[in-house]
Amino acid sequence: MNGTVTVLDKGAVRIHSYMSPADTFHTTTQLIETPARVIAVDAQLLPAYADEAIAYAKGLGKPIDRLIVTHAHPDHYNGAARFGVPVHALAQVTEQIIARGDSRLPTGEVIPLSEFTPSVAVIPGTEVIDGVTFVFEAVSGGEAADELLIKLPEQGVLIAQDLVYNDVHLYLGNNDITGWQQAVDALAAESGYDTVLAGHGLPTGPEVYADVRRYLTDARELLGDDGDAYKKAIVDKYPAHVGPFIIDIANRSLFPAGN
């Protein structure tokens, strides 16, 4: 396995957090193991890494019940077809995925839209799955236009995905630092959650919110009108962070004339 898996025992639930290697900026697929099934959250940029997460999940000896895609960025849905189960997403996220169209891998290979279009709408609210309470909330603004936040209140777990990165450079291509700061503030105001699952990086705890806030504050200060200068400045500020290529991807949106 090229990726790594971190296992968290939460009583009736076990969390298996698959994290891709640094070449795809430590993107995560969360495998939520309930008594009789597995709920998968997000599907990787590279299908090969999705295959690793799926092979691990199958080793648990329980069927994968569904795949939930949290937002409309390809590093979270390109591998969706590999799971072979219904793909769930917020209606607005599905619309955004459709608007993006076919996905092109770094190799040039094209993944047709039909392979990853969600087919089941996630309705915000509470759903009990295999005896486990899941709370689904829609969050607007920040890292993406819309994101799904998943809470497991009985286990004290927040599946924040790309609302939170852990020691990985932040993708700012949505050009909404203020919205992201507000989303993180809302997460930080939650009580009773000691485990936070990040969309990039290892599982963490509430202490990650201060880290994300600090990075966003620094990014706002360092962002000017030159993408290369911003990248150098933020990498110098956070030399240990993984995934500086994320900055290049974001800069194409932030500075389209110069990239």
Where are these regions (language model features)?
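Accessory terminal helices/loops
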Residues: 2, 189-191, 202-259
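Conserved beta-strand hairpin/beta-sheet module of binuclear metal-dependent hydrolase folds
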Residues: 5-55, 149-162
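Short Gly/Pro-enriched turn/cap motifs at secondary-structure boundaries
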Residues: 20-22, 117-119, 138-141
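Divalent metal-coordination and catalytic microenvironments
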Residues: 32, 42, 57, 71, ...
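Loop/turn elements at helix/coil->beta-strand transitions in domains of secreted/extracellular proteins
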Residues: 36-37, 62-65, 86, 132-133, ...
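Short catalytic-loop micro-motif centered on adjacent basic/acidic residues
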Residues: 39-42, 66-68, 135-136
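Metallo-beta-lactamase
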Residues: 45-47, 133-214, 218
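Active-site HxH/HxHxD metal-binding segment of metal-dependent hydrolases
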Residues: 55-126
